[in-house]
Amino acid sequence: MASITLKGNPINTSSNLPEVGTKAPDFLLTTTDLDVHSLTNYKGSKVVLNIFPSIDTGTCAQSVRTFNQEASELENTKVLCISRDLPFAQGRFCGAEGLKNVVNLSDFKDGSFGKAYGLNIVDGPLEGLHSRCVIVLDENGIVKYTEQVGEIVDEPNYKAALEALQDA
């Protein structure tokens, strides 16, 4: 269990993020077109998992915008933006913002992604949503970098994630 904060108030996650050097757990997540994708859909590409509570918050929206901008410069890399939002909300946001360099995926059906990755919030006002995390995977799905953002209203360390991607 990781202890994080929401505006200074302590909250907890269901477990810890996967360890660097381990194989990332597979997942089944829903696209904005209501297709189902798994990690194997991205095999052979480096992957950035940008995970957040809801696309409808300012910090979460900014993380998607920032990674969308960075993704346009990245070779052989997919940026997956993952939340418990309905796929329709994710699609609406990216459509309105003109964001085309990231893939939005939803864990709305059963939360199994959050459970497998240890990042479900288990108490406090955001209970049941994902905590803010970034995980970088190499082309074989091996975890190369993780960040569990300590204060949920803060943005992730984009620079560190992008540097880890260079080494993946």
Q: Where would I find each of the regions flagged by the language model?
A:
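Chalcogenol-based redox active-site neighborhoods
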Residues: 1-168
